Amino acid sequence: MENTVTKREKFSYGMYFMGQNVFYGLIGYMTTYFTDVGITAALVAVVALITKVWDAINDPIFGMIMDKVHFKKGKFLPWLRMSVIAIPVSTILLFVIPTGIPLVAKVIWATLAYMLWDTAYTLCDVPIFGIVTTMTLDQKERVSLNSIGRIFAIFAGIVTGILLPLVRQSLGGWATTVIVLSILSAAMMIPMCLFAKERVIEREKARDGGAEENYTLRDMVECLRSNKYLLIFFAAPLINSLLNIGATWGLYIARYCLGGEEIASFVSMAVIVPTLIGAAIAVQ
């Protein structure tokens, strides 16, 4: 068995991140879609609040399940393979709310679909970060994989922010646009499921018969409290979520303040360009 991560695996890892972050970018337009189908802004906020509470609950639960459940074909890869189906299906369900049903039914549909999407996203997000530790023991290779993932994720954000408004205008509707982009994004995620190898798991099984050290929730919290670099690492997604507010409201700004949705791509560029400059400075 090869002991180093191949170029094909690294490219596949980056492509998975790209597909995943196109899905994440699509959710930035969910608020606009909900109001377009007749759900008021206040009710959209309620839907988001309920889902965020569910998100806080399902993340640690899924982490514990992942530690306890053992598959014959790997620790993380089986979850990633499930996500290739779960994330596009749940994304499409968010953008096909029937316009003719009562408002209450729309809110229920939106809430359940968003909670399902959040669960599906957890299904792909936790394993794609965790699999780095089972692909290689080499710290440089792990850093390389994470860097590749971030680069592809940033590129996905750029592509989604600039092209989605244009694609939507070309295809003529939310449902068609989301279905097409979901199929393309899922295709980007498939190579990772086919070509990645969990070498560390296989070596550990061969060495000690599969014995695995378990950690409690208290151990995890203590580790987080005592490691400032880990705190910074977990703060980064929170900051990124705040930055994504620009993408979420960009279509509203273009539609109601700037005279038309065709301006939305330029609004996205106004957010993305400073982000890229900041990222370049941070690397230095």
Which residues fall in each region the model found?
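Membrane-embedded alpha-helical bundles of multi-pass transporters/translocases
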Residues: 2-284
